[in-house]
């Protein structure tokens, strides 16, 4: 049933335990998908992206450097490719013109033949984008253009069909009022639709807008939110504002035209790892270390629409962009079918049952001793009535 209903899932979430979770918000159901049966932490999901076929195909980037192809129509994994090179986890994943684009922590960006299953083949292109990468983001309007940034690694824009040098390299802001250098820590990047501008959020709670068409390479707009590192960011449907999340579970909407705070969203209890707005509906999906997927309404009245506890720490998510969320057909339920137990809770229930049996066997002896003591009190000759 999970495979048959996979196409109707609204949100896909990658977990720290290596499980891909599909969540249907209308039915309030979550299904687990794994390539090898049992989940392994060595296969923790660190990146997700849609394939070139739209939302029928998904690419799943894992900690063991494999990129798995998942069919959302059939609910099954359809192969994988090992992408070696560099160190660390995937910080970005993309697909363009039959090629696969990967980028890891150590700053190695590689382009691969997407259909090539030979793991020993060399990449088509390799770029060194600088160490400490936190995010690689593809330009939706130009799939061969990507942006990178990280800790002490300033924002850069790369044309994968051009030279091996960045087409834009951001310049750090001027020294602060103490004439001290301002550190760099770009955590997330987004391309603004209909323009060449980009927006970044930083580990020092800054939101910055860059314009490569401008003569200056410094930000054309900068604002701050809160006191804690910003970890994730997404564009709102209109493209005039962004929603950012930080390490304390705080969410806020920032206007990119004036740099002011438009409002906040409540409910999160842990560091935010993934954010995505629906392209046409006023909905925001968020996930993080508190293991809960939340769907907020971002237009007045703001508030929490859905909340699903998913048992594992959540690293990333993809939100379906379809509009017919409420129009999906109701598939018939199979009679007398026993649901499969969740692999994440098998060991927990087994340990609880064993503990209960030990406790029950230990209680049998004290109960017998208690009855003996009560009988002794009622022997003949006792002064008790």
UniProtKB/Swiss-Prot annotation:
Q: Which Pfam family, an example, fits this chain? A: WD40
**GO cellular component terms, semicolon-separated:** nucleolus; nucleoplasm; nucleus; preribosome, large subunit precursor
- Altering residue 185 to A: what's the impact? Reduces interaction with NVL
Annotated stretches, region: Required for nucleolar and nuclear location: 320-385
Q: Where does the protein principally reside?
A: nucleus
Where is this protein found? Nucleus, Nucleolus; Nucleus
**GO BP term (any one):** RNA metabolic process
The superkingdom listed in its UniProt entry is Eukaryota
Write down which residues bear the modification named Phosphoserine.
214, 361
GTP-binding among keywords: no
UniProt keyword annotations, A-Z: Methylation, Nucleus, Phosphoprotein, Repeat, WD repeat
Q: What does this protein do?
A: Regulatory protein of the MTREX-exosome complex involved in the synthesis of the 60S ribosomal subunit. Participates in an early cleavage of the pre-rRNA processing pathway in cooperation with NVL. Required for blastocyst formation, is necessary for RNA transcription, processing and/or stability during preimplantation development.
The record's subunit annotation is: Isoform 1 interacts (through WDR repeats) with NVL; the interaction is independent of RNA or pre-60S ribosome particles. Isoform 2 does not interact with NVL. Interacts with MTREX; the interaction dissociation in a late stage of rRNA synthesis is required for appropriate maturation of pre-60S particles and depends on the ATPase activity of NVL.
The name on file for this protein is: WD repeat-containing protein 74
Record organism: Homo sapiens (Human)
């Amino acid at each position: 049933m999970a495979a048959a209903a996979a196409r109707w899932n609204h949100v896909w979430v990658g977990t720290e335990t290596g499980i891909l979770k599909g969540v249907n918000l209308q039915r309030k159901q979550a299904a687990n998908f794994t390539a090898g049966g049992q989940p392994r932490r060595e296969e923790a999901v660190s990146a997700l992206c849609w394939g070139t076929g739209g939302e029928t195909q998904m690419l799943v980037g894992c900690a063991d450097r494999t990129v798995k192809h998942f069919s959302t129509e059939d609910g099954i994994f359809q192969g994988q490719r090992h992408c070696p090179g560099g160190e660390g986890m995937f910080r970005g994943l993309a697909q363009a013109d039959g090629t696969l684009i990967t980028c890891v922590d150590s700053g190695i960006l590689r382009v691969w033949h997407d259909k090539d299953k030979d793991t020993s083949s060399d990449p088509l292109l390799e770029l060194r984008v600088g160490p400490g990468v936190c995010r690689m983001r593809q330009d939706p309007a130009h799939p061969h253009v990507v942006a990178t940034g990280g800790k002490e690694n300033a924002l850069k824009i790369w044309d994968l069909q051009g030279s091996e040098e960045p087409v834009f390299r951001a310049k750090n802001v001027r020294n602060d009022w103490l004439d001290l250098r301002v550190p760099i820590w770009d955590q997330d990047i987004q391309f603004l639709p209909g323009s060449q501008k980009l927006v970044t959020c930083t580990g020092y709670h800054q939101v910055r807008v860059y314009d490569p068409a401008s003569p200056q390479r410094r930000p054309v707009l900068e604002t701050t939110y809160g006191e804690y590192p910003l970890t994730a960011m997404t564009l709102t449907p209109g493209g005039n504002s962004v929603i950012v999340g930080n390490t304390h579970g705080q969410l806020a909407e920032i206007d990119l035209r004036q740099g002011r705070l438009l409002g906040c969203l409540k409910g999160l209890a842990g560091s935010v790892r993934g954010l995505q707005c629906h392209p046409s509906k006023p909905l925001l999906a968020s996930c993080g270390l508190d293991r809960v997927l939340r769907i907020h309404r971002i237009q007045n009245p703001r508030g929490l629409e859905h909340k699903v506890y998913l048992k594992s720490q959540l690293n990333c998510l993809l939100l379906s962009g379809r509009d017919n969320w409420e129009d999906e057909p109701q598939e018939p339920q199979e009679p007398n079918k026993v649901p499969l137990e969740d692999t994440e809770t098998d060991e927990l229930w087994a340990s609880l049952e064993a503990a209960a049996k030990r406790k029950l066997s230990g209680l049998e002896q004290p109960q017998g001793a208690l009855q003996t003591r009560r009988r002794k009190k009622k022997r003949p000759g006792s002064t008790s009535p």
